[in-house]
């Protein structure tokens, strides 16, 4: 009898695993359930900082009427914004996993949130509801472009070498993000960049984490990145509780960039921000022309940021086809577009694809199951926000550095003797980290590609959509002079 029960139990479990395997194509893509779970967790820890950082960017900046996001003029509503940030990120990331079966997580976009906070919400008479309404409009526009096939057509018109360069450039960019977040490099010196103070306790946490990450990875230990993140976090907590290091500031330059602080385990989330947006308010406060320019700038950054991240993840996971396209491209772009809309509706700024997803891919993630794991963890973070704050930048940064190396290996796919694509590829790679913008690097590469082809008398070889994309980027780069000329 007991043997029959055990056999029935094992059969049910096997059937469940088989259904899960078939749905997410886990075995087909050379992965395992364990690898997907580890990858999903690593991705979450690599980008969990957004739950803390997004509130600090959009929650501490008053709008054009002097009001803070969530109401009030003095005390930022950081807890409310953190809960909404985690909720929206969790929902759209799960959607990416289930609908598109792609190991790519989404959350409020860094850079995009700064644009919303400083370039839109801060305009005279503009409210936070107006600013979030513009984000919703941008998301709707980009969704229409996906459904009509235009966004996917632009993506497929990009030469393979430029797609490869985008992945390599993002690798350098994410390495710089990791080094900067850890304080290993700084821009505070006499040079553009210089090495940080290596004699601090937070730097010790980063270095220990980096060494451990490298050692575990070269020895092919499963869960290398996750183990290093958790180990470095424990070290940071011990140092913080014994030495009371605190957060970095002018009076405490040797502090943590995000000090681990235990304030409890659970927190009841406040979702009051959801739905606090106005679709038409900005048209009344700043006018139609300004609205169009602002939506266009948001759209371009979102449009090509996602394209670059999508390619980088696919290349690292070896999911791209011979033309450099990931599977189910349209489904990926549909979810990404809906995420932008959801970000505006949730009052947390446009949600977009996160390049930190490559950290999970580096840990073995190959399917949407990893995204589901990441999304569920974000949903848990709405209740466990105190625990999320325990992971300092210094503990998560080593994973980003290693991922940067892994993405750099793609550079062998570029023929450097073929100047038509080599020069644009170089500019794409170089300008992403140097401008601290994925979109700027892609734009420079697109424009250079058209110029080189034109100069060599090969204009007919350029796809008409590449001409259009290059022209759009010219407008993108000249938006500030255009605004100045129009007095807006």
List where the protein language model places each region.
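Helix-loop-helix hairpins and the membrane-proximal interhelical loops
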Residues: 2-79, 194-195, 229, 233-330, ...
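Hydrophobic, aromatic-rich alpha-helical transmembrane segments
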Residues: 29-40, 74-82, 86, 127-131, ...
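Short helix-coil transition sites and intra-membrane helix breaks within transmembrane domains
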Residues: 45-49, 99-109, 142-145, 220-221, ...
């Amino acid at each position: 009898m007991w043997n029959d029960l055990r056999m029935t139990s094992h059969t049910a479990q096997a059937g469940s695993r088989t259904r899960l395997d078939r749905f997410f194509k886990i075995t087909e893509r050379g992965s395992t359930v364990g690898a997907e779970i580890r990858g999903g967790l690593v991705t979450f820890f690599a980008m969990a900082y957004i739950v803390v950082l997004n509130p600090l960017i959009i929650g501490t900046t008053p709008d054009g009427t002097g009001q803070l996001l969530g109401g009030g003029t003095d005390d930022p509503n950081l807890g409310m914004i953190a809960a909404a940030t985690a909720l929206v990120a969790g929902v759209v990331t799960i959607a990416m996993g289930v609908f598109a079966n792609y190991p790519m997580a989404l959350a409020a976009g860094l850079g995009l949130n700064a644009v919303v906070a400083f370039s839109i919400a801060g305009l005279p008479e503009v409210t936070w509801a107006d600013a979030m309404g513009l984000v919703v409009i941008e998301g709707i526009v980009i969704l229409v472009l996906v459904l009509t096939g235009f966004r996917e057509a632009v993506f497929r018109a990009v030469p393979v070498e430029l797609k490869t360069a985008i992945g390599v450039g993002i690798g350098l960019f994410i390495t710089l993000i990791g080094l900067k977040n850890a304080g290993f490099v700084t821009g505070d010196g006499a040079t553009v960049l210089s090495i940080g103070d290596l004699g601090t306790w937070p730097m010790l946490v980063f270095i220990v984490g980096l060494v451990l990450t490298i050692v575990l990875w070269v020895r092919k230990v499963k869960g290398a990145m996750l183990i290093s993140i958790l180990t470095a976090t424990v070290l940071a907590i011990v140092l913080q509780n014994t030495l009371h290091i605190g957060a970095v500031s002018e009076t405490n330059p040797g502090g943590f960039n995000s000090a681990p602080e235990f304030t409890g385990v659970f927190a009841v989330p406040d979702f009051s921000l959801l739905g606090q947006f106005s679709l038409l308010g900005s048209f009344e406060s700043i006018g139609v022309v300004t609205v169009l320019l602002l939506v266009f700038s948001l759209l371009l950054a979102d449009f090509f940021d996602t394209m670059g991240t999508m390619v980088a993840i696919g290349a690292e996971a070896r999911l791209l086809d011979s033309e450099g396209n990931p599977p189910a491209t349209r489904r990926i772009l549909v979810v990404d577009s809906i995420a932008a809309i959801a970000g505006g509706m949730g009052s947390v700024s446009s949600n977009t694809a996160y390049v930190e997803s490559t950290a999970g891919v580096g840990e073995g993630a190959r399917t949407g199951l990893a995204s589901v794991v990441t999304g569920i963890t974000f949903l848990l973070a709405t209740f466990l926000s105190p625990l999320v704050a325990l992971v300092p930048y210094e503990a998560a940064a080593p994973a980003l550095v290693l991922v940067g190396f892994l993405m750099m290996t793609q550079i062998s796919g570029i023929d450097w003797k073929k100047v038509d694509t080599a020069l644009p590829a170089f500019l794409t790679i170089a300008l992403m980290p140097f401008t601290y913008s994925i979109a700027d690097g892609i734009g420079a590469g697109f424009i250079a590609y058209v110029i080189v082809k034109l100069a060599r008398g090969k204009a007919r070889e350029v796809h008409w959509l590449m001409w259009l994309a290059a022209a759009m980027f010219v407008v993108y780069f000249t938006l500030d002079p255009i605004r100045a000329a129009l007095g807006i």
